[in-house]
């Protein structure tokens, strides 16, 4: 994992650690933490890192509160700690 990707992963996990159980963050919050000036340029990487964190079971990606597959999610997404609620694939 490249330094930027590691920093994004650390930022995602760190931001979630600061939030209440079940709370969500936007991937842009992690990108802003890593590079406040050029965070928009990091957004594709932030979503890719979030997808890897989903794959390893660390976080869930949601849209409108429902867990979604990062491979098919389009548009705004939120991230939360894994195990946080309803799933598009069945009971969460």
PLM regions with names:
Residues 1-7, 83-92:
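Short, low-complexity, intrinsically disordered N-terminal peptides in bacterial proteins
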